[in-house]
C-alpha cells in the first residue's frame, strides 16, 4: 500500500486545482484531499473528522428511508468532533471555486440553525488551503 506524504498529497491537490479541464466530481475530489491531509496532519484525531453522507441523487424511496432514519438535508459535509476553547465542534461545508458552487437554501438554514446556538463553528471551504487554514486556526493551542 502506497502511503502518501504530505508534500506529495499537497502537490497533487494543487495540480488538480490548476487544471483547466472540468472534473466530473470536483467537490468530491476536494473533500477527499482535505480528509487525507487531515489524516496525515492529525493522526491523534483519527475518527474525529467524519463525512455526513447527505449529498448525491437518490430515489424517492431511498430518500424517504434516510429521512425516517434521521437524515437532515443541508447538514454540513464534514464534522470535526473536537472542542476548542470556544466551540464544541467544527462544521465544514465543502464547495468549489466554481461560480455555480453555492450553498443551497437547506444548507443556509442548517448554518443559521447551528450557529445561532453559539456552540459550533461553521465554515465554508472552497480549496484545500481554506480547509487547512480553518482547521489549523480551530485547533490552535489545544493539541
Predicted ranges, named:
Residues 1-143:
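Catalytic phosphate/metal-binding cores of nucleic-acid and nucleotide-processing enzymes, i.e., regions
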Amino acid at each position: 500500500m502506497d502511503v502518501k506524504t504530505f508534500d506529495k498529497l499537497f502537490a497533487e491537490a494543487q495540480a488538480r486545482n490548476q487544471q483547466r479541464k472540468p472534473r466530473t466530481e470536483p467537490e468530491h475530489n476536494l473533500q477527499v484531499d482535505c480528509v487525507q491531509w487531515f489524516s496525515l496532519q492529525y493522526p491523534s484525531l483519527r475518527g474525529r473528522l467524519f463525512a455526513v453522507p447527505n449529498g448525491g441523487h437518490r430515489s424517492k424511496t431511498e430518500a424517504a428511508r434516510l429521512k425516517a432514519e434521521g437524515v437532515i438535508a443541508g447538514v454540513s459535509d464534514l464534522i470535526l468532533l473536537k472542542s476548542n476553547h470556544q466551540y464544541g465542534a467544527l462544521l465544514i461545508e465543502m464547495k468549489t471555486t466554481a461560480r455555480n458552487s453555492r450553498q443551497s437554501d437547506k444548507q443556509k438554514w442548517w448554518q443559521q440553525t447551528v450557529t445561532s446556538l453559539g456552540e459550533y463553528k461553521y465554515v465554508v471551504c472552497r480549496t484545500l488551503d481554506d480547509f487547512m487554514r480553518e482547521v489549523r486556526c480551530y485547533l490552535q493551542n489545544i493539541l
